[in-house]
């Protein structure tokens, strides 16, 4: 039985929505002007349903653009069609500024609570 990856599903879903999305931020020289990273940060399983908590980080050249991208992603989560295998998505917190000291690139983050299948 194949394992369902919420991170892979969200990355594909965001890509299909026109947003460059990755597990890990690409090197600065290879990165698009705006992109999104997706990371499962926790969660639990109950009654054969996976309930992952996911951090979505929105990166851009300026703080304003990073915030706008985060708001766009927030609206997609709340108002858009769900990725295949996902029954529920809701913003837990964010978007909020989450500046990256290492790359010095503006970044906003939001946390999403999800209910999804355990397997494909």
Residue spans of the language-model regions?
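Short, charged interaction patches at domain edges and termini
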Residues: 1-12, 29-30, 41-49, 89-120
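Small/polar-rich, solvent-exposed N-terminal microdomains that initiate assembly or binding
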Residues: 1-46, 64, 68, 75, ...
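Short hydrophobic/aromatic beta-strand micro-patches
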Residues: 57-59, 115
